[in-house]
Amino acid sequence: MPKQLSFSNDSREALENGVNTVANAVKVTIGPKAKNVVIERKFGSPDIVRDGSTVAKEINLDNPISNLGAKLIEQVASKTKESAGDGTTTATILTQIMVQEGLKNIAAGASPIELKKGMEKGLDIVLEKLKSKSIKINGSDIQKVATVSAGGDEEIGSIISKAMDIVTSDGVITVEESQSLETELDITEGMSFDRGYSSPYFVTDQERQICELENPKILITDQKISTLTNLVPILEEIQKSSSPFLVLAEDIEGEALTTLVLNKNSGVLNVSAVRAPSFGERRKAALEDIAILTGARLISEDQSMKLEEVTINDLGKAKKITISKDKTTIVAFDDTKDLVKARVEKLKREVEITESEYDKDKINERIAKLAGGVALIKVGAATETEMKYKKLRIEDSLNATKAAIEEGVVSGGGQTLIEISEELSNLGKEKSVDLNTGIKIITKALLEPTKQIARNAGFNGDVVIADIKRLNKGFNANNGQYENLNQSGILDPTKVIRLALQDSVSIAAMILTTEVAVADIPEPEAPAPGGPGADPMGGMGGMGGMGGMGMPGMGGMGMPGMGGMGMPGMGGMGMPGMGGMGMPGMM
């Protein structure tokens, strides 16, 4: 494909255009008086969102170089979302102002490299001061943080606070859609562990990059699975039951993993695979815990149990399993509650007789995972569009609350950044003029989130900043008053602010030091068949013959050469996944 090249100031200006386009669309979503963004969908109703990352992902520009800038700032939002779960709009706003100020100075003759060094030096100072201002969160602050992160929605703040109080920091909180109009909180058995899907091809929700299995059957084993032979009998039973299926094993690889992926993508099986958590003996113990939670039988080598002998009665079950790239959450049925309690009591007795402090800590971690349970926030709304909107707000708020528990909180509304900006401007100057300019770029950027919060609330951002400095109070955009924001309960998670700063400086510095941009030249759209003025329905001809019924996956299950589940190219030609379990091209 031919490439379009752009050099020097031209490349940076085009990148800036892309940055500005995305940032201008995103920054209306910050603060308690934020505005919504409506996103068209090819199928179904439009989405109404107030989330920076979601908006940024949807934007594609005609100019290839500008589109690179759009994708770079989308990366800022996505990375901040992935790491902190919130703060995407703040990161986007910071990136935009840094790029704008940096390019102004480069056009005036400043060295991009020296500016980058100055920005990085300024960032280091800001992060030190941010850490010193952070305070640990207490119980009453959880609801305040959740409410602020939900755009001032007190109902959401209250629900998240109750959920955190019930399951504690060791429990799991999940968000799902409800059939009712009300948003409800439900506590059930369950747990999570730090392992994700074995292949991204198992993803069922592309936008959120997760795999969700409703009422799945679960195979749990401490064995490695690499060949298809071991799985064939149980896969045949699963296909007959039409149940979703999760394989939780020490490892799953090679032919076995490939076969599961292909049958998943061809629609033959709704399946996923996850590696077992922990290591060594602790891995087996963790699998035993999960087996008890789900009512499964642990298929263990120690008991001379073979995978090919597994029946559907040996499998566990769950209400729902959600798998991301690095985490698995199991929502269990209540019928295993007594077994879980007995398991917890057994583990507590183990703690009492264990001498090693390290071993005690590990057993206590297992107790916390089993006993913590899962809090289900069931989101209700009058319409599907409202439900999706509300669900996104709750997820953002939940992520912000978790971040606050991890690293503490600071004064919200951008107030802490304004204080640090003042302190930064009073520091001694560096020898290099451009290095100083880089620090000044950071100093100015720290004011921008508050300015935008004020603009979204209908106030002049510059006037608000001046009043904040004069009165030495924060700006409450909810009521337009200047207050002590800590006392007003307006708090921001330190982790969210830290990651927004780090990610924005990283991308802004890369854009400022770019000298050449290379992008694909879009190919012209192909003309309509028959040329201009031709009948669009003409020339369709007859349909080709269907040939034989040698469609892939039509046969039974087995290894290559056995008829059904085999490697590609083993049988007749046809569409994948039309029949039984199989790989493409199997008979």
Swiss-Prot record:
Pfam families: Cpn60_TCP1
Entry keyword set: ATP-binding, Chaperone, Cytoplasm, Isomerase, Nucleotide-binding
Presence of keyword DNA repair: no
Superkingdom per UniProt: Bacteria
Subcellular localization: Cytoplasm
Binding-site list for ATP: 29-32, 86-90, 413, 492
Cross-referenced InterPro entries: Chaperonin_Cpn60_CS (IPR018370), Cpn60/GroEL (IPR001844), Cpn60/GroEL/TCP-1 (IPR002423), GroEL-like_apical_dom_sf (IPR027409), GROEL-like_equatorial_sf (IPR027413), TCP-1-like_intermed_sf (IPR027410)
One Gene Ontology term of the molecular function aspect: isomerase activity
GO terms under biological process: protein refolding
Matching SUPFAM superfamilies: GroEL apical domain-like, GroEL equatorial domain-like, GroEL-intermediate domain like
The protein's Enzyme Commission number: 5.6.1.7
Mitochondrion among keywords: no
PROSITE patterns registered for this protein in UniProt: CHAPERONINS_CPN60
Catalytically driven reaction(s): ATP + H2O + a folded polypeptide = ADP + phosphate + an unfolded polypeptide
Described purpose of this protein according to its UniProt entry: Together with its co-chaperonin GroES, plays an essential role in assisting protein folding. The GroEL-GroES system forms a nano-cage that allows encapsulation of the non-native substrate proteins and provides a physical environment optimized to promote and accelerate protein folding.
Assembly and oligomerization: Forms a cylinder of 14 subunits composed of two heptameric rings stacked back-to-back. Interacts with the co-chaperonin GroES.
Family, as annotated: Belongs to the chaperonin (HSP60) family.
NCBIfam families assigned: GroEL, PRK00013.1, PRK12849.1, PRK12850.1, PRK12851.1
Protein name per its UniProtKB record: Chaperonin GroEL 1
